[in-house]
Amino acid sequence: MGLFDKFLKKEEEINLPALEVADDEIVALADGELIDIATVPDPVFAEQMMGKTCAFKYGEGKVVLCAPANGTLGVLFPTGHAYGVVMNNGVELLVHCGVDTVNAKGEGFRLLNKKQGDAVKAGDPIVEADIKKLSQNYDMSTMLIITNDNGLGLEFVDPQPVVRGQKVTK
């Protein structure tokens, strides 16, 4: 901590209304559109090679991406482009914001008040993404992947408009 650190402007916290979500539910990360996964221009996601996958599109500007379920933040990439949640029932989820956005090296992403290993509730803010800035160089489809469904046979709902906290599995 430097001598003048206390004078530096701190980033303001992002507070969103708390959600009441059951431990076995998977929900939308933010307000947007759940789109057909086959339209994502990356075969790893479009062909669901990592597990059952859905994709979201968000409006221009900044979007706060939240935890899709109750559990533990199992992984949080320092670049902000991806994070994973291990649900309380053992189901493992991965959120990947944009295609090839690892190449942005964190530009356009801001980590929010959570760190790897933290307990999270569905709807807790994890990352802020500047969709307008990032979409200049990347497809900004945001994928939600069930990398391990713990034998539950989970399926995503059909494409539709969604709001943060809306259940997205059948």
Regions found by a protein language model. Name each.
Residues 2-170:
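Contiguous, well-folded functional domains in the mature portion of proteins
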